[in-house]
Amino acid sequence: TGVDVQDNRFEVVTWAVGRGEEMWCIDYSVIYANPADERDWSLLDAYRKTIFQHESGQAMKIEAMAVDTGGHFTHQAYNYCRQRERERVFAVRGDPQPSKMVKSKATVQDVNWGGKIIKKGVRLWYVGTDTAKDLIYGRLCVEKPGAGYVHFSKDLPHEFYTQLTAEARVPQRVAGGEAYRWIKAPGARNEVLDCTVYAVFCTHMLG
């Protein structure tokens, strides 16, 4: 499960991953809240307890959650994740450097918003967003069910697909030549894509 934190809501996308990293979108939810109020973060706890039902009847629970900490509510996100690391709730931040691994070594963030040292600070994981997006968009091109194929529910709104495909890989001039970067279309929203990137990170954490 990937979580993107916005000013007035949590955007959440849950994926199931099978053999060969075949993927199924299980749920897309928008949870309206005030992320500045740490009490509202309990809404994510309620969501994490959701039990989804496989078509075979088997119950499926959320195995891991990655929460974006790069927005306006960094320390609230740190605090939430720090208290739940043993429950596989990961504090993450995107790293757009090319060729950056989806999962890199974590750094410990042990200073709170007031500059005070926190005992047992939160581990912050940097996610190679360009690499993850390469992987996601590559899978969207797989046409037959099986390894790498992506399944979607018929109940997903049009906005879901618009956000998932809101970025394009375009050439940009850099020192020494040209490089490709993932760029969001002007005025577009990409929360679903960000959540999916963080969900892919979770699969790497779970091995």
Task: Please describe what each predicted stretch is.
Residues 1-6:
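Two-metal-ion RNase H-like nuclease active-site motif
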